[in-house]
């Protein structure tokens, strides 16, 4: 019974982190995005959700402690955000928000260590089904809330309050349902894919379809990554050469290509924002302005950027620039080290089995990298995408660790400290015996 309650809570927490359930409670001020802490109801909901999370962390403290090593870089980045209170331009605000971002990171570690990858995808699938259904109902029955009537008239925003947020969520939903082959019933998976795709198109977001197209191209590349080294090396060189040529072509003809997509060369003003924030970055190069310490509307340092732009910017529309503004080169370095380590684990996991589940971590890491080039921010409190990143980092590291133990045959002699053989298949993608062997053979042999 307790396990069932815990699963329902995890599902509710994932939905809460989308901000879809609480968006209507934030108020009507155009600047409420910076001061949600002023809403007592939101603070109470936040305290309850993270309080329950802490209770489950304590209940499974051994798993949680074991996952801390796998989460080292992401936890260090969250703790740097907390430490930035010492030099923040708004220390009290930074302290409040950094405490919540640490709590969000803790939930990600708990979720990634508590549930194996197949179960995570099942929970995420139901999360996005609920999110997509509620957004469709909101747009159709409550169009004054669910459809943009101002800046982007006619574009759907659902319960998320902004068309790009809906497009981003539905993109992740598509990746989840695609990766859940063999985990969800086929009918449910196809229905989820179609619903998320329809809402992504109705949102009018341009970034989401472009990132989806890039992810589809990468999907074909994942098959190549499973090839033998004698095949992999020349194919990698060929693809790298092709990719470099494509980049040069895109840069050279960017105006024409963006015109085909209905975009300006400035990417709807994004390049102007990027140029404007460079001056602010250079004056706080190493440690930034503190977590959530820069963008404050017409107050503080962000007022100068807004004056240069002629409008009030809420973020840099680039996750890496936002991270640099808030935590400086130190924050960027921590994220880069953690991302590269996670990417390495994702590649190892991919080569362990052909199941689509094995490609989920790489798909999510690619989504993070591509989407944060034009949107932002990366590190954010009460944010589903940061919590999922932490969970995927932990899950991929643990899956690779179990795979390495299977390869070395150490699980047979490790005693009660190791996961039992019945638990092991949940952490690694299943595969049938073939050229690369069987990950879960009775003899404990792994792929070679």
Spans of model-derived segments:
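Transmembrane signal-anchor hairpin modules in multi-pass inner-membrane enzymes, especially those
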Residues: 1-82, 113-122, 126, 181-187, ...
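Loop-to-helix entry and N-terminal half of a specific, functionally important transmembrane alpha helix
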Residues: 13-14, 314, 346-374, 385, ...
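Aromatic-anchored transmembrane helix interface
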Residues: 42-43, 70-79, 90-113, 126, ...
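Hydrophobic, aromatic-rich transmembrane alpha-helices
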Residues: 47-63, 171-181, 329-351
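Long extracytoplasmic/lumenal interhelical loops at the membrane interface
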Residues: 260-275, 283, 287-327, 350
